[in-house]
Amino acid sequence: MRPDYTLTDRDFINPDTIDLYGNTNAHLLTAPPAAFVLEFPGLGGGSCLGGCMDVGPYNGPLSGFLAERGILQVYTFPGPWSWMNRGAVRMIHALVDAIREKYGFTRETPWAVMGGSMGGMGALIYTANGDPAYTPTACLAHCPCVDVLDRVYCKENIPRTFFRAVADYEMPIAEALKTISPICRVEDMPHIPYHIINDLADELFPPEQMDAYVEALRGKGHTVTYHRLPNCRHGELTGEEWEVIRTFLLGHLVK
């Protein structure tokens, strides 16, 4: 530690420590990447899109596909109960800075955020951060929770995670939860392309809440591709939808 004990975010998250804050597909790249994707974890640290918080190379369902096309993929570690709270946003900002520095990316370099369940909600809430320096090129959310206040008690072990996510906010708990609830942040969403996936047999988050959220986004003039998957339970995807995900990412990341 420095003699004066001063530390900055970069002392923790920098080009040399990226692998401690996210698993990447860098080992699969055959040339310097031209774009990047950040994937956010679901509750507990895993992901219905393939990620795992065990530190190591990322070999998820999209890792090789993206690497072959010059796209760095990073499965981030903002915390298994974070729900993209302000601490998670700060960590992701620092990680974006480190990635840009390591790979020589500029603010014009295309990048996307994505995730499923808590990670899908995280992708939406992170996109609403309000700082143009950290506004992604595109956002993909699979089966996200979009109405936190309504779904706090959707499962016995869920309330503690929401409480922990915003426990240090100096405001009433209901107001704090609104800051991480997508339906309450529609006004803050930037005008970028969105792809949102709704599992119609979802046992945690009612499909009609997603319908209302997408309608609200479109009502504000946002470009949203919206797929409703019949018979899919929470976190499930069809083979056809995986292909749609690949097409969406390539369409916005490859020039």
State what each model feature region is:
Residues M1-P32:
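N-terminal cap/lid segment of alpha/beta-hydrolase-fold proteins
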Residues D150-E156, F163-D211, E215:
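The feature captures the conserved acid-bearing segment of alpha/beta-hydrolase catalytic domains
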Residues H27-F65:
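Short, surface-exposed "cap/lid" segments of acyl-processing enzymes
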Residues F105-S117:
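Alpha/beta-hydrolase fold nucleophile elbow
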Residues L124-M171:
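Hydrolase active-site cap/lid region
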Residues P61-W83:
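Conserved alpha/beta-hydrolase
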Residues S82-F105:
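Alpha/beta-hydrolase active-site loop
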